[in-house]
UniProtKB/Swiss-Prot annotation:
Protein's job: Catalyzes the GTP-dependent ribosomal translocation step during translation elongation. During this step, the ribosome changes from the pre-translocational (PRE) to the post-translocational (POST) state as the newly formed A-site-bound peptidyl-tRNA and P-site-bound deacylated tRNA move to the P and E sites, respectively. Catalyzes the coordinated movement of the two tRNA molecules, the mRNA and conformational changes in the ribosome.
Lineage: Bacteria, Pseudomonadati, Rhodothermota, Rhodothermia, Rhodothermales
Protein name as it appears in the record: Elongation factor G
GO CC annotation, single: cytoplasm
Name of the gene this protein is made from: fusA
One Pfam family in the UniProt entry: EFG_C
Comp. bias regions, Basic and acidic residues: 297-309
PROSITE patterns in the record: G_TR_1 (PS00301), G_TR_2 (PS51722)
């Protein structure tokens, strides 16, 4: 394919969005429909083409269009829309997290029957963390039990959201026929035969006039809070509030995250999708509408550097996804925050402290790639060339280095041993695991030094099942898989003042390093940190500054092997406050050893405890089985939390150690005759009770000596 010149597309007409949803809310169907409608509009310039459209839909049903790339570019109403894929399953919340990090706005998708489900809450919290403005779409209005108003109430109760309908459904379930546009004051009835390409605009049906009036007043009152002029018009009965005025103020309130405009429809039945696209262009932000991104200088974390979404600023971008493409090899998806980048350029990776060369650059469409020669501020593109970039890394202009805010990924909580079935599979297994680990920052691979086994770790059983499946499908590797094991951690609970001297003299040059340090758990005010918080308070050069990083490196290596059972130590605070060195016998190696051995000594005396991953579990069950299920969760060391009702079912929330949840799917099926369902996601690491901890440590000792 010939390389296209990427003409500068107006930033104010660019939208970088994601679709956030629970696993069965209909995200794939909505995405397919968006790609279908925007694809026809972009290529043909005309949407209303009955026969061609229906042919395309037939193929679509056969092929099942899905977004396999991390980002897809499409066009709607003179706007360019980049859709960043966000998965729905809880084991993949990290995928959602990294998507939200680089998008500007989102469509929050809800099932009209299920409403706000556990994953909806998780994704909503992540969107709040990254200040992402949202519009909402209540999907599946054609399903039995669909209830638009119930979804709004659940959003208020469970998400503390402010949903403001700009539409109201005409009917529900089998009777769903269209929507009332509360801004225009008209009914929109969709034509089933035209695959949603044609609709009639009518007067509001008599039986819905009072409902429409109620929700229009709700819309006007909600919006009037954000604009004095509009408020005066609303209060003055002689003045009509124009649709354009409403759009302007709704946009302002949405960008400030004060409200979530709500749409409704059925993606499967092709109703309401174009209106959601209008909502994307009308209400969601362009790159110009979001604050400039702030990073820091690679050599000085205290020096803030700001990058605005302008082409005349130095180039900066974040790599948010790495994939392997069968045709072009390693693809790195980047979000450009400032400046421009031409193919063939060299960029600097401050996190790796090395240069990378950019080869090809391309925009990904639903079913094709578009090679371009330049990418600009606001663009989302895939690049070929970088060898060592990882997810979350910054790339920038070598003459203007900056580290943009990096992504924090949770540590894996479950691990299994894998081994190739044949010698021929060994290299393929190593190669496959390396590539998969490059793509997914929550998937770890390591070799157990004592047993020689390859250990893979991830966020849940499903996560690792999919990894094993991908090894088979993509890399043609057959692997034997061990039993899942919990990824325990260790933590320090007491503060220790450690003085350690390394002094070795064995003829010729010796080794000398002396350190004084406080070692203990991270203080409460810094609890968001999870690894090592290292504070350097050395004064007067008693330890030369070039040796300080060596002490930190030594501590980090010692943290990988805890004093209780050899599990990694989490949440450590160290203050290096004094020490000494020798002009000849001190070097970086000596201080690294002193840091490692000094920390190891301190950790033994800091009252270490074993920590286990505790999962947030939600079970939805008919009344009849509630007692048995609660009893079973208690038997798994579960702490029962909030209980309530959702539609006709009971909802039980509990916190349960991961070690007690293996095989729960089968047990729950037996307890409830297959009628209860559950979801589970990582909550936090908590201390293991003493009697359980001693069993785990005994097992670990036995396996180490076996």
């Amino acid at each position: 394919m010939a390389t296209q010149t990427n003409e500068s597309f107006p930033l104010e007409k660019t939208r970088n969005i994601g679709i956030m949803a629970h696993i069965d809310a209909g995200k794939t169907t909505l995405t397919e429909r968006i790609l279908f409608y925007t694809g026809r509009l972009h290529r043909m310039g005309e949407v209303h083409e009955g026969a061609a459209t229906m042919d395309f839909m037939e193929q679509e049903k056969e092929r099942g269009i899905t977004i396999t790339s991390a980002a897809t570019t499409c066009y709607w109403d003179d706007h360019r829309v980049n859709i960043i894929d966000t998965p729905g399953h809880v084991d993949f919340t990290v995928e959602v997290e990294r998507s939200l990090r680089v998008l500007d706005g989102a469509i929050a998708l809800f099932c009209a029957v299920g409403g706000v489900e556990p994953q909806s809450e998780t994704v909503w919290r992540q969107a709040e963390k990254y200040d992402v403005p949202r519009i909402g779409f209540v999907n599946k209005m054609d399903r039995t039990g669909a209830d638009f108003e119930n979804v709004l109430e659940m959003m208020e109760d469970r998400l503390s959201a402010n949903p403001v309908p700009v539409q109201y459904p005409i009917g529900a379930g089998d009777m769903f026929r269209g929507v009332i546009d509360l801004i225009e004051g008209k009914a929109i009835i969709y034509d089933d035969e035209s695959q949603g390409m044609q609709w009639d605009v009518r007067e509001i049906p008599d039986d819905l006039e009072s409902k429409a009036e109620h929700w229009r007043i709700n819309l006007l009152e909600s919006v009037a809070e954000y604009d004095d002029e509009l408020l005066m018009k609303y209060l003055d009965e002689d003045q009509e509030v124009e649709p354009e005025e409403l759009h302007t103020v709704i946009r302002k309130a949405t960008l400030n995250r004060d409200m979530t405009p709500m749409f409704c429809g059925s993606a499967l039945k092709n109703t309401g999708v174009q209106r959601v696209l209008d909502g994307v262009t009308n209400y969601l932000p362009s790159p110009n509408d979001v604050p400039a991104i702030t990073g820091h200088h690679p050599q000085d974390k205290e020096e803030d550097i700001t990058r605005h979404p302008r082409e005349d600023e130095p180039f900066s971008a974040v790599a948010f996804k790495i994939t392997t493409d069968p045709y072009v090899g390693k693809l790195t998806f980047v979000r450009v925050y400032s400046g421009t980048l031409e193919s063939g350029s060299r960029v600097y990776s401050p996190t790796r402290d090395e240069d990378e060369r950019i080869g090809r650059m391309m925009f990904m469409h639903a079913d094709s790639r578009e090679d371009v020669d330049v990418i600009r501020a606001g663009d989302i593109a895939a690049v070929v060339g970088p060898k060592n970039l990882k997810t979350g890394d910054t790339i920038c202009d070598p003459d203007h280095p900056v580290v943009l805010e990096s992504m924090d990924f949770p540590e894996p909580v479950i691990r299994i041993a894998v081994e190739p079935r044949t010698k021929a599979d060994r290299d393929k297994l190593t190669n496959g695991l390396t590539k998969l680990a490059e793509e997914d920052p929550t998937f770890n691979v390591r070799t157990d030094e004592e047993t020689g086994q390859t250990i893979i770790a991830g966020m849940g059983e499903l996560h690792l099942e999919i990894i094993i499946d991908r090894l088979k499908q993509e890399f043609k590797v057959e692997a034997n898989v061990g039993q899942p094991q919990v990824a325990y951690r260790e933590a320090l609970t007491d503060m220790i003042d450690e003085h350690y001297v390394l002094k070795k003299q064995s003829g010729g040059r010796g080794q000398f390093a002396e350190v004084y340090m406080d070692v203990g758990p991270i203080p409460e005010e810094e609890e968001e940190e999870s690894g090592l918080v290292f504070e350097n308070e050395i004064k007067g050069g008693v330890i030369p500054k070039e040796f300080i990083p060596s002490v930190e490196r030594g501590i980090e290596s010692a943290m990988e092997d805890g004093p209780l059972a050899g599990y990694p130590i989490e949440g450590v605070w160290v203050r290096l406050y004094d020490g000494d060195h020798h002009e000849v016998d001190s070097d970086q190696n000596a201080f690294e050893i002193a840091g490692r051995l000094g920390f190891r000594e301190a950790a033994r005396h800091a009252n270490p405890v074993l920590m286990e991953p505790v999962m947030e579990v939600e079970v939805v069950t008919p009344d009849d089985y509630m007692g048995d299920i609660i009893g079973d969760l208690n038997g798994r060391r579960g702490q029962i939390g909030q209980m309530g009702q959702r539609n006709d079912a009971q909802v039980i929330n509990a916190e349960v150690p991961l070690s007690e949840m293996f095989g729960y799917s089968t047990d729950l099926r037996s307890l409830s005759q297959g009628r209860a369902i559950y979801t589970m996601q990582f909550g936090s690491y908590e201390p293991v009770p003493e009697e359980v901890a001693s069993e785990i440590m005994d097992e670990q000792t036995m396996s180490a000596t076996a």
